[in-house]
């Protein structure tokens, strides 16, 4: 049986107005059981909405540590996290997983010429240091 994608994305409601506390609270809300109309206590995750996606504003655009020609990647191609609003992305991902949620975030390649050429900014087998996450070039 085919089901449509189900989950929550930060951009749809908050745009750039996000921070770690807000996203962690959203995660907690997705697993909170509530009773509606006298029925059995149910959470959004019980209904299949178990994916949380952080869209934009986790990265440090315009960082002084950014590589020449880049907006938020260092010289090795690693994204630079905005530690003011997301002090610990690993803790946030761990929190999602402790709640049995899946989580992810939007990562765009830079510069635009690389995107146009369908090139990978980083080594395709690079493993993110804070989470076992592989970055691959899209098809």
Kindly give the residue locations of the regions a language model identified.
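N-terminal module-boundary/linker segments of secreted carbohydrate-active enzymes
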Residues: 1-32
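Aromatic-lined carbohydrate-binding/catalytic grooves of carbohydrate-active enzymes
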Residues: 26, 30-139
